[in-house]
Curated annotation (Swiss-Prot):
Protein family membership: Belongs to the UPF0725 (EMB2204) family.
InterPro entries: MS5 (IPR006462)
Name of this protein: UPF0725 protein At1g19060
Lineage: Eukaryota, Viridiplantae, Streptophyta, Embryophyta, Tracheophyta
One Pfam family here: protein_MS5
């Protein structure tokens, strides 16, 4: 066997892969249709979501990621880095008008180090601390639709293929409270805080796995961090108090309404024996 030939082939493959990712980095992962991936490389796949036959596997997720970019800078070209699965954990490093480039050096998301732990849900008395918390008024909820967006992102991050636009349209925010480390004057300035934690109580979306009907009030926490140096927006969120699989008998589970509903709709069933929540995340570029 000619080991020299094998070594040379491997070096050529590594060089081709490095060149491919160099070209992607130069384009910041936008307009990549003309960049061809070498054989065997892990490639980015472009989708034209305006075409009826684009067949993106998660169209609702694309819509919400685009909304996250619009929320960041109200612009049109968005790069979203999904850091983990099973909960909301994303960074939006780019949000700008489509076709516009900058001469600034792109700062990778890995350089934006943030804690991935959420705070505990505060006690009822703690919410009365006006120097830390601000209870969002009903009129302010209507004028700050990013709060609803955060909730939708959390639900989609956890349920992903099991949720639709029609499901999200049923959501009703019962109460939203914003916490900041520093006191802000006037208090509603917390709505614009670059670093904040949002506590949301909501209803309208049933969850058979925790025996929760549409009128059952559920809780979500979302932490927002905007880094002024890098321009990166970080969103971390999860549902609170919803341990999905605790002391479940297999016979009971596989005959449960939740499991049968997944099978009926040809969805991959969620179970404690098919745990797919551990992963490395993904990167989505949206034009």
């Amino acid at each position: 066997m000619d080991w020299t030939m094998i070594s040379g082939s491997r070096d050529e493959s590594l060089h081709a892969a490095r060149d491919y990712w160099r070209r992607l980095n130069e384009s910041e992962c936008f307009d990549i249709e003309g960049i061809e991936a070498p054989p065997g490389a892990i490639a980015l796949i472009p989708y034209d979501c305006q075409l009826p036959n684009s067949f993106h596997p998660l169209p609702l997720w694309v819509k919400l990621y685009a909304s996250a970019g619009l929320h960041r800078f109200n612009m049109l070209e968005v790069l979203v880095n999904e850091r983990s699965v099973g909960k909301l954990n994303i960074i939006v490093p780019i949000a700008r008008p489509k076709g516009v480039t900058t001469n600034e050096r792109f700062i990778p998301c890995d350089c934006f180090s943030v804690d991935d732990k959420l705070p505990q849900w505060p006690s009822h008395d703690s919410f009365n601390d006006r120097k830390r918390f601000y209870s969002v008024k009903e009129s302010e909820l209507q004028n700050n639709d990013w709060i609803n967006l955060y909730l939708e992102l959390v639900l989609c991050a956890i349920q992903k293929v099991r949720i639709s636009d029609s499901d999200l349209s049923k959501l009703k925010i019962v109460k939203a409270v914003i916490e900041t480390k520093e006191d802000m004057v006037p208090p509603n300035e917390r709505l614009n805080a670059k670093t904040a934690v949002v506590y949301i109580t909501f209803k309208g979306l049933a969850n058979a796995r925790i025996a929760a009907g549409e009128h059952y009030e559920r809780k979500a926490i979302i932490r927002r961090i905007f880094n002024e140096h890098t321009g990166h927006l970080s969103l971390l969120g999860d549902l609170i108090g919803e341990k999905k699989f605790v002391n479940i008998d297999p016979v009971t589970y596989f005959n449960s309404p939740a499991y049968l509903e997944d099978i009926t709709h040809e969805l991959p069933p969620e179970s404690p024996w098919m745990d797919i929540l551990a992963g490395t995340g993904s990167m989505d570029q949206i034009d």
